[in-house]
């Protein structure tokens, strides 16, 4: 499956780009499915669906807020080393600076939306 260019999805769904200087050409979404990476963010990567768009909602976000900087660095580095098409933070949740730094190092685009995870997922499925 060829997929859809991320630039098209960003424009169509009015996503906020969190890493402004990241080039999006060549980044494609090949699967219409998404993944909520709660288990991966807690360290469990068996059966990880890395080819899916990764959606960070309130559950994932509040879990990350309970980690110290060393724990965050470890999990962000591990999570973002995979060939992820992009990560989207829902409900206007803001990724922290360390997350953005690790994403940039691994060339993983990070976006935001004011929509809830359910509404974003529904809108995205329509576009893909």
Question: Residue ranges of each PLM-predicted region?
Answer:
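Fold-independent oxyanion-binding glycine-rich loops
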Residues: 57-59, 91-92, 114
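A generic secondary-structure micro-motif detector
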Residues: 65, 88-90
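Short, surface-exposed connector motifs at secondary-structure boundaries
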Residues: 79-85, 104-107
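Charged, amphipathic alpha-helical linker segments immediately N-terminal to NTP-binding catalytic cores
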Residues: 94-119
């Amino acid at each position: 499956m060829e997929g859809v260019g991320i630039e098209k999805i960003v424009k169509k769904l009015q996503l906020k780009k969190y890493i402004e200087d990241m080039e999006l050409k060549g980044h494609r979404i090949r699967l219409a499915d998404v993944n909520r990476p709660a288990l991966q963010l807690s360290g469990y990567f068996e059966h990880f669906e890395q080819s899916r768009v990764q959606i960070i909602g309130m559950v994932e976000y509040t879990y990350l807020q309970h980690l110290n900087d060393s724990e965050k660095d470890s999990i962000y580095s591990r999570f973002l080393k995979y060939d992820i098409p992009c990560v989207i933070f829902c409900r206007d949740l803001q990724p922290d600076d360390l997350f953005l730094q690790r994403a940039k190092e691994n060339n993983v685009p990070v976006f935001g939306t004011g929509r809830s995870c359910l509404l974003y997922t529904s809108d995205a499925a329509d576009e893909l």
